[in-house]
């Protein structure tokens, strides 16, 4: 993760904007734009949902809502600080036993989204650790992973990203 964690938010946004532009240039329907990510990618989902106003839906699997203080130079605002800027419908999928993202942070994210009047749903899986969807790791939890994937697919269908 050192290389990924050294990427400034501005560069992340530029890369994702370029990806969207490329998809559009290839005939992709960017009016149905959605984003999904896991772990650091889940954090990126929350950040990009605030950056790209065309995004319809965002699904964050165990995305960090609060950044470590040491990252402030590269990541000036935590996802939770960007909540007022979010336009996309946000689905957050978290493990209750996540050692890196305490339930208290998930609750803070929920409160911020609710307080800002955002369209969102947060689901926390009892006993599931961080990485519960990674079937190549010991943290994999089949039942939670399958339900979370079904939730994500349904979310994208509900908000017009998938048909």
Label each PLM-derived region with a short phrase.
Residues 23, 27-38:
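Alpha/beta-hydrolase fold nucleophile elbow
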Residues 54-65:
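A conserved short beta-strand
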Residues 99-105:
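Conserved alpha/beta-hydrolase "acid-adjacent" motif
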């Amino acid at each position: 993760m050192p290389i990924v964690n050294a990427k400034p938010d501005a560069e992340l946004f530029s890369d994702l904007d370029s990806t969207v532009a490329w998809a559009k240039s290839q005939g992709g329907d960017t009016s149905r734009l959605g984003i999904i990510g896991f772990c650091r990618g889940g954090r990126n989902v929350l950040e990009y949902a605030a950056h790209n106003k065309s995004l319809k839906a965002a699904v964050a699997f165990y995305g960090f809502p609060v950044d470590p203080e040491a990252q402030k130079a590269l990541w000036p605002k935590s996802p939770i600080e960007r909540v007022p800027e979010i336009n996309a419908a946000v689905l957050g999928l978290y493990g209750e036993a996540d050692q890196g993202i305490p339930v208290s942070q998930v609750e803070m994210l929920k409160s911020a989204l609710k307080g800002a009047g955002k369209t969102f749903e947060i689901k926390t899986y009892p006993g599931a650790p961080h990485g519960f969807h990674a079937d190549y790791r010991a943290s994999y939890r089949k039942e939670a992973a399958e339900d979370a994937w079904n939730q994500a697919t349904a979310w994208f269908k509900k908000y017009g990203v998938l048909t």
